[in-house]
Amino acid sequence: MSQSAAPNDDTKNAVYKRVTLRLIPFIFICYLFNYLDRVNVGFAKLQMLDDLKFSETVYGLGAGIFFIGYVLCGVPSNLALTRFGPRRWIALMMIVWGTLSTCLLFVSTPTHFYTLRLFTGAAEAGFFPGVVLYLSQWFPTFRRGRIMALFMSAIPVSGLLGSPFSGWILNHFAAGQGGLSGWQWMFLLQGIPTVVLGVLAYFLLSDNFASARWLAAHERSVLEADQALDLANKPKTEKSALQEVFRNPAIWAFGLIYFCIQSGVYAINFWLPSIIKNLGFADNLVIGWLSAIPYLLAAVFMLLVGRSADLRKERRWHLAVPMLMGAVGLLIAVNFTATPAIAILGLTIATMGALTGLPMFWPVPTAMLSAGAAAGGLALINSMGQMAGFLSPYIVGFVKDTTGSTDLALYLLAAVIAAGSVLALRMTRGLQR
C-alpha cells in the first residue's frame, strides 16, 4: 500500500512520458502550422510585391499589423479559453485563423492585405499563451524546460520544412496554374491544413487531466500531486486576477524581456528570405533551402539547451546566453554581407540564439506568477512580446526603403536583444528551478 501511495521516480517518469506522447506531437503540429501561417508572407513577398506593386513599407506594415490584432485580443482570448475550455477554444481559433490565412490569396490592394492580416492576428492571439497555460496545468515547473523546447521546436521546424516547401510552391506554380500565382497557391496550400487540424483538436484534446479518459486513476494522482506542490510554491495574492495582471511590475518586466527576444525572432522570420536573396541568390528554391539551414541547427540547439536547463535546474544563464547569441549573430551577418558564407553563418547563430530564447523564457514567468495572475499575465506578456512582430518588420522595411539597406535596422535589433539579456539576468536572480 505504501508503494502505491508514494510513486517512485520511474513511475512518475512513465506517467509524464505517456502524457508527453499524447499531447506534444499534436500540439507541435498545430503550432507548426500556426507559425507557418504567421510568417509565410516572408516568402510570398518574393513574388507578391511585384504582382501587386506593393512597396517594401507596405509589406512591412502588412506583415506587422497582424500583431496589432494579436496584442489587442491576447488577454481576452486567454480569459475566454479558461471560461470555455482549451479544447473548444483552441479548435475555434484554428478554424478561424486557417480560413483567414487562406483568404490572403484574394488580396489585391494594401487595404485588403492590412485587413486580413489584422483579423488573422486577432484570431491567433490566444493560441500560444493558451497552450503555455494548458501545458503548465499538466507539467510541473521542473519539467517545463524540456516540454517547452519540444513544443516550441515547431518554430525552427516550420522554417526547416516550410522554407523549402514555400520556395518549391513559388517555383512550381510560377506559370499561374489555375489562374493563381505562386504566392496565392502558397496561402491556399498552407492555410487549409490548419482548418483540418482545428476540427481534429476538438476531438483529440482534453480540457485537463481530470477529464482525460485515457489516463488511469493512479496516473491522475501523480499529476494532481505534482500540480498541488507547484501551486504551494507559487506566490499568493489577495488581488483579483485582472488587478494583479496590470499592477504587477514583474509581468511588465517579463513582457519587455519577451519583446526583446521577439524583436530578433521576427526580424529573422520575415526578412531571412529577402536577406539571403540580397546576398546574391536568385532561385526561390535555393533561397528556401538556404533559409532552412539556420532553422535546422536552431531546432537541435533548442532541444539540447532545454534538456540542459531541466537537468541542471538552471534557468538564468540558459535564457541570457542564447539571447546574446542572437545579438552577436545579427552583428556578424550585417558586417559580412560581402561574404555570403559568413553572413549565413551569422544568420544561423542569430536564429539559434533568438529561437532558443523563446522556450527558455516561458518556464520563468510560469514559475514566478501566482495562480490568479497566470492566465491574464501570460497573455499580457505574450501580447507585449508580439508588439515586436509589428515593429520589427515595419522598421526593417522602412529602413530598407529609406537607405536601400537593412544594415541600420539589424544593428538596432541587435542592441534591443542585448539589452533584453541584461534585463533577463536581473529579473532571474535567485531563480534555480
Q: Can you name each region flagged by the protein language model?
A:
Residues 315-364:
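C-terminal transmembrane helical hairpin of 12-TM major facilitator-type secondary transporters
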Residues 53, 85, 106-112, 123, ...:
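Helix-breaking motifs and short loop linkers at transmembrane-helix boundaries and internal kinks
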Residues 116-153:
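Cytoplasmic helix-loop-helix junction between adjacent transmembrane helices
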Residues 146-171, 193-194, 382-392:
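Glycine-rich segments within core transmembrane alpha-helices of 12-TM secondary carriers
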Residues 82-94, 310-323:
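Cytoplasmic membrane-interface "Motif A"-like loop-to-helix N-cap segments
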Residues 72-111:
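Conserved MFS/SLC helix-loop-helix module at the cytosolic interface between two early adjacent transmembrane helices
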Residues 41-42, 243-302, 358, 362, ...:
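Extracytoplasmic gate region of multi-pass secondary transporters
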Residues 73-85, 301-314:
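Helix-to-loop junctions at the C-terminal end of transmembrane segments
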